[in-house]
Structures are given as structure tokens and as C-alpha cells.
Amino acid sequence: VKITQNGLDSGDVSRGSPDHAVTTETSVAEQIEVFRGPATLLYGSGAIGGVVNVVDNRIAKDFVGGVRGFYGLGGDTASNRREMTAGVTADHEQSVWHFDAFTRHSGDYDAPTFINEEGESVSSVENSFIDAQGANVGVSYLFESGYLGVSYGRMEQQYGIPGHSHHDHDHDHDHDHAHDHAHEATHAEGPYADLWQNRVQVHGGWNNPSAAFKQVELRYGFTDYQHQEIEHGVAGTTFGNRQHELRLTATHEAWQGWTGALGYHFFDQEQTAAGAEAYTPDSTTRKHAAFWLLEKEHQQLNWQLGARVEDVQVNERSFTPVSASFGVTYSMNDAWLLSA
């Protein structure tokens, strides 16, 4: 499954290991989209499990009608989680400004009593704490036939890595300690990840540029990411990711009943890993791709066709993947769909 934010890659290293976090934050999102079948070829050729796209309003396409805001508080007793989110979007002359932020803290979460690796009876998953915070700011300029905007976001997160803790029995501690102190003990006794990410995105759109096209959209993203896996106060392994991504998409008018979009996708990524568990070699990846998605509705059937051609270079090796996909959905009624 590929995770994107506003149609651009999440920019983390979560696909490399199950204990690497996804950096796309859903608590301040406007909506979450799920794509399967031919539509996934707009985003890449390897998303066989689908694409999850998190959409926010940091770069607004329309005026919000004055000032609009949100706030939220959340928590639970299983991990003593405490979460707060807030955001505001405001019109100012021909521009729209946006700011949002979140903070989240939780200790080790409760679980049915089980015997751990040391043979002890415990009722919580050791080293499962999370401390995270982030903020984002964006501005867009709206004109008669489109928009242009930029956003910047920063995320910082520390989270425990369960399953890697080993007790020093000369320094046993009480397993019934309060949840709000769980992450403090875990920092000292078990490995955890210390993560940060900076993200810049630029979006632009041009409506009705010609008789053949409804809209042309440009999206660019730059991401700088790092996380360190820390044990006994020492950074054992450091992972880094810097990437540039550009997507140009043109949505065309109906042709023989078929609507759709075609475009160009550029991706440049430099991934690094150093330390005791750096099992993935450093790599530099560059991709150029062209894609086309077609869709047609006929009575209760929705037909989709997708194609993508890529020129991929990983270090000194080159590849030319070619992908095609076909899908159909049958609408049985308002509640049921059959897809193939």
C-alpha cells in the first residue's frame, strides 16, 4: 500500500520495516481517499495493495467564506493517550491562509495478561509509547482561472519499538507504574525511534485552459526526513530520506464517452542508512513517468483503463517498467458494489 499526502509521496521510510512510522498525519486531514485498480497507476507502478491519499486544506483551492477553524481533544485509558489538534483557515483579499498543529502523548498500552520473553506476567505492551507533535502553515493565491500556493510542515516524534526490550535483572522495576510515566522508563530501558521531518509542497491549478482540457494541475513536494533508533542513550542506526517530486496532471473533456486524466511524474530520492542495523544499502533513485487514466459510465457499470510507462534509474542500474490495468464496477444498488 502506498501512502500519499495531497497526491505526493509521504517521504518517510515506512515501507522498509514494520517498525518505521508513517509520517502522514490524519488527525488534521480534511478527507482520506482510497484508490484501487487502474487509478493507482497515477501514483506509481508498485502499489498493488492500493493507494491511501490523505488530503488537507493547507493550500486552499477556494475561498472559505471568512474564517473557519477546528479544534479537537482526544484520549483513552488503554494507553493514557492525550491528544489535541487545532487549525484555522482565513480569507484575506485574494489569498487564503492556513495554520494547523497537533500534539499526542501516550504510554505503554494495556493488553490481556501474558508471559513476556523474560517469563514475567505482564499486562501492558512494553515500549509502545508515542510522543508526537507537528505544525503546518500554508498560503494560496486565488485568481479567476485557478490558484497557486505553498505550504510548510514540521513533524517530530519519539516512539518505542516493542519486542526489542531486555531487562537488567539487577535493576528490576515495578511493572505497575503509572501510565503517564511509562514512556520515561521506556526511554531509559528500551530502544526507541527519534524522528523528524520537514515537508514543503507547492500546488497550482489552471481551470479550462483549452477546449480539450478541463483543468491542468501542478504539484511539487520536497521532503527531508531522518530517524534514529536509540538504545541505552546511543543512536545505533540512522535512516535518512531526501526527495523531490513533481506531478503534472491534465484532466481532459469527454471523448467518445470516456473521461480521464493524463500526465507526467518526476521523482528523485536519496535514501541513506548508517549504523548497526543498516541492512538497506544507500540508494539514489530517479524516475520519469507518463500515465493515462480513462473512465466511462454506462448504466450500472463503471469502466476504468489505466496505463503507465516509467524510466527508472537506481544508482547505476536502469529499468523501463510498463504497466496497464483494467477494472469494472457494477452498482447493484445504493449500498452494494461489485468490483473486478
Residue ranges of predicted features:
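Short acidic/polar hinge/loop motifs at secondary-structure boundaries
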Residues: 8-36
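Residues on the lipid-exposed face of transmembrane beta-strands in outer-membrane beta-barrel proteins
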Residues: 86-92, 137-141, 202-206, 246-252, ...
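Flexible loop and strand-edge segments within Gram-negative outer membrane beta-barrel domains
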Residues: 126-128, 132, 146-216, 222-245, ...
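Periplasmic-side early beta-strands and strand-to-turn transitions of outer-membrane beta-barrels
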Residues: 65-70, 79, 83, 87-193
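Membrane-embedded beta-strand positions of outer-membrane beta-barrel proteins
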Residues: 69-73, 99-101, 139, 150, ...
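Transmembrane beta-strands of outer-membrane beta-barrel pores
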Residues: 73-79, 92-94, 103-107, 143-145, ...
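Repeated loop/turn-to-beta-strand initiation elements of outer-membrane beta-barrel proteins
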Residues: 94-97, 145-150, 209-216, 256-262, ...
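Structural signature of Gram-negative outer-membrane beta-barrels, strongest in the C-terminal barrel
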Residues: 141, 259, 278-340
